[in-house]
Amino acid sequence: MDIEAFDYHLPEALIAQTPLKNRDESRLLILGRQSGYIEHKHFKDVTDYLNEGDTLVLNDTRVMPARLFGMKEETGAKVEMLMLTQIEGNDWEVLLKPAKRIKVGNKLTFGEGKIIAECIEELDQGGRIMRLHYDGILQERLDELGEMPLPPYIKERLDDQERYQTVYAKASGSAAAPTAGLHFTDELLERIKAQGVNIAFITLHVGLGTFRPVSVDNIDDHEMHSEYYQMDEATANLLNSTRDNGNRIISVGTTSTRTLETIMQSSDRFVAKSGWTDIFIFPGFNFKAIDGLITNFHLPKSTLVMLVSAFSSRDYIINAYNQAVASEYRFFSFGDAMLII
């Protein structure tokens, strides 16, 4: 398929620059997966569309303050490093800016030497594998020196760093938030549980793919970047019993969706599993895991627009996006949401 099929016009003014005061007061577009039917609600109304016995699957990853500003040890030249994925031990895949002059063997220093990063492998498009040297616990060094890695389309400074975390964020390791989850409050989750809906958690650490646009004209030629995921036995058992009882599995976000569908590609039942996934979901994909999807509005021509188009249809999704634009919904990470069901 041609990538232009997943384009739509978005006025820049509709890109949300800051979160709303109250998470669950964002707008919610309801889209009938099979019919294309559209309804306009608010996120706190999501309870009207969840049934007793359904299971809501959330990604409990936590965003690291993974943007570091430092200098090249040899020259003192300024450099920015965005930590993306832990490869093994202290070796991390990162994005550097500028990257051109950072070669294997070069060292970068951050916080007057509190973190030193040595380049051990050069990748394309500004990517590098860096070996980190530091005293103590890395998370503590990042909390001290790092900044939250907001997407490039957000120009405003974030006053409260926790607003780029879900209220249930737990497992540190992401370079970006699973943004569909940003709309939930503790109170809303309690209301959902009170009506007999199950809450389940998986983990997928959001990595490089979030920051890289599709660079091919034919989407069949696109290759996804790998991201680490895990699901425990308790969650697998809950999802299997949900399915056995004839109830629905509602995925919160494309990251939860990619995790669940990865696991179900090699099995007819949910199983406890961890590993790396590069699953690319686009129209024609056979969904085996989910019955509904809560997701934000995504960038034109992105793999995430392709994923939601696969779950519903390209025509229904583009029509819904165009209606959202006409209704002045807020787009992207701090924007509004849609429920496809």
Curated annotation (Swiss-Prot):
Protein's cellular compartments: Cytoplasm
Record field: catalytic activity: 7-aminomethyl-7-carbaguanosine(34) in tRNA + S-adenosyl-L-methionine = epoxyqueuosine(34) in tRNA + adenine + L-methionine + 2 H(+)
UniProt record, GO biological process: queuosine biosynthetic process; tRNA wobble guanine modification
Domain of life: Bacteria
Pfam family, one: Queuosine_synth
Keywords on record: Cytoplasm, Queuosine biosynthesis, S-adenosyl-L-methionine, Transferase
Keyword Cell membrane: no
Primary location recorded for the protein, binned into one broad class: cytoplasm
InterPro entries: QueA, QueA_dom1, QueA_dom2, QueA_sf
Entry annotated with the keyword Transferase: yes
Gene3D superfamilies the UniProt entry points to: QueA-like
Gene Ontology CC annotations of this record: cytoplasm
GO molecular function: S-adenosylmethionine:tRNA ribosyltransferase-isomerase activity
EC number assigned by the record: 2.4.99.17
Pathway listed: tRNA modification; tRNA-queuosine biosynthesis
Quaternary structure and partners: Monomer.
Matches recorded under HAMAP family: QueA
Family, as annotated: Belongs to the QueA family.
NCBIfam families: PRK00147.1, queA
Free-text function comment from the UniProt entry: Transfers and isomerizes the ribose moiety from AdoMet to the 7-aminomethyl group of 7-deazaguanine (preQ1-tRNA) to give epoxyqueuosine (oQ-tRNA).
Name of the protein in question: S-adenosylmethionine:tRNA ribosyltransferase-isomerase
Annotated source species: Staphylococcus saprophyticus subsp. saprophyticus (strain ATCC 15305 / DSM 20229 / NCIMB 8711 / NCTC 7292 / S-41)
